[in-house]
Amino acid sequence: MEITVEHLGSVQFEIRAGNHSIISDQPTSDGGFDEGMTPPELLLASLGSCAGYYAAQYLRKNKLATEGTRVRVTCEKVKDPLARMTNFVIEVDAPVELSDEHRKGVEEAVEHCLVHNTLLHPPKIALKVAGAVAAKNMK
């Protein structure tokens, strides 16, 4: 998997993956134009959309309605001593009443989400900083 991120000016960045792109920005109170989600919001969006995918797959497999399924993801921001996000909560609201069996099934399905599991088992992250020549080759 690979994405590229390019600075557009001010505090905006274009994020590209394959044929798709989105803009990351900051609120006007932080010098942005508020034209896109912030990086922390994108992390929540990634977790929520992954959870939604797995929830909908479970519902579809069990011949239950999927359209209108909603996922809400919340977290807390802390500084201890580094600023980070913690205490994530994923809430899945199916468009139909669920039996206890199906409620548990949705929960188990969401627990297979790649993003969910990555956050539960943090990966190693390597950081490499390069100069102008390497940056030109990224395009």
Model feature map: region roles:
Residues M1-A45, A55-K139:
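Extended beta-strand/beta-hairpin segments
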